[in-house]
């Protein structure tokens, strides 16, 4: 059985992202994260918020955030470089990154065992780029078609008929595959200036793995999320109230009470949100 480090990258002024990271840890800890072969790493610019939590913390400086976001052009570069940093400093066999608005509904161990030199885990396949009806995908075709980009010292990249978009809400790799993530960040740094979309980071991971002959498996069936706007508007104040009540750093108290947090929206709330959206 592989050892695994569960990685969360969270930063910025919005507490909801940090609270989401904590909820992710709390909801999985007693079931899966406290196993002898499991560790947790949080890459954050707010290390004090994770004091007392059973994780190692890598502290993001302003300089790192600026460089990794291409001087503020696109913050998702911080996610890639944060993952790379965690991979470079872990002794676990595999590194498994989740976005802060995701949480496990099934044991992640079977997913971890599928990770190898030729297989990584991503959230889901969102389809090919060329000829897509997806408006966001079209921006890649518009921005990249008939262009070549330098990749490394002796490679070139160009959009191909096999180019696909894979979501990176989850990203599972062997911890020694640092070059894969480095390549993804290099491609991200080149493409970001040419594509008017916020998904260049995950596209870059998808493309580098394809070029490298590495297959991608979907991990979506193992996860639940609160990533939609409606869910975020419901969950964020609930988490804020929880940590206001119990404090930010009392892990044992959080662990004893986290299951009182109701992530799923009541039907009445969902209905009100839909009506409000239609009227706005």
What positions do the PLM features span?
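A short, conserved beta-to-alpha structural element at the edge of catalytic cores
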Residues: 122-147, 264
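GT-A fold catalytic core of metal-dependent nucleotide-sugar glycosyltransferases
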Residues: 80-134
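Catalytic core and acceptor-binding pocket of nucleotide-sugar-dependent glycosyltransferases
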Residues: 151-241
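A conditional alpha-helix N-cap/helix-loop micro-motif detector
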Residues: 21, 73-76, 198
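Long, low-complexity C-terminal extensions of enzymes
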Residues: 233-280
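Glycine-rich, basic loop-to-helix element that forms the pyrophosphate-binding segment
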Residues: 68, 77-82
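N-terminal anchoring/stem segment of glycosyltransferases
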Residues: 1-69, 88-91, 267-280
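Short, charged, surface-exposed secondary-structure boundary motifs
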Residues: 65-73, 129-136
């Amino acid at each position: 059985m592989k050892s695994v480090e569960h990685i969360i990258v969270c930063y910025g002024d919005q507490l909801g992202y940090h609270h989401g990271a904590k909820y992710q840890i709390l909801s999985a800890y007693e079931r899966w994260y406290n196993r002898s072969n499991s560790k947790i790493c949080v890459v954050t610019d707010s290390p004090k918020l994770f004091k007392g939590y059973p994780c190692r913390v890598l502290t993001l400086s302003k300089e790192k955030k600026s460089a990794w976001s291409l001087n503020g052009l696109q913050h998702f570069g911080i996610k890639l470089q944060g993952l790379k940093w965690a991979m470079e400093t872990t002794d676990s066999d595999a590194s498994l990154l989740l976005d802060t608005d995701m949480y496990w509904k099934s044991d992640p161990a079977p997913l971890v065992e599928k990770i190898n030199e030729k297989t990584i885990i991503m959230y889901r396949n969102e389809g090919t780029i060329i000829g897509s009806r997806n408006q966001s995908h079209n921006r890649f075709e518009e921005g990249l078609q008939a262009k070549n980009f330098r990749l490394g010292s002796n490679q070139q990249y160009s959009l191909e008929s096999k180019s696909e978009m894979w979501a990176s809400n989850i990203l599972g790799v062997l911890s020694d595959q640092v070059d894969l993530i480095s390549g993804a960040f290099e491609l991200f740094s080149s493409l970001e200036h040419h594509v008017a979309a916020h998904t260049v980071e995950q596209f870059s991971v998808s493309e580098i793995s394809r070029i490298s002959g590495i297959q991608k498996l979907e991990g979506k069936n193992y996860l639940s999320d609160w990533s939609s706007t409606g869910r975020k508007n419901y969950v964020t104040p609930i988490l804020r109230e929880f940590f206001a009540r119990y404090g930010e750093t009392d892990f044992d108290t959080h662990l004893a009470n986290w299951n009182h947090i109701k992530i799923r929206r009541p039907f009445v709330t969902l209905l009100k949100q839909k009506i409000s959206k239609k009227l706005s």
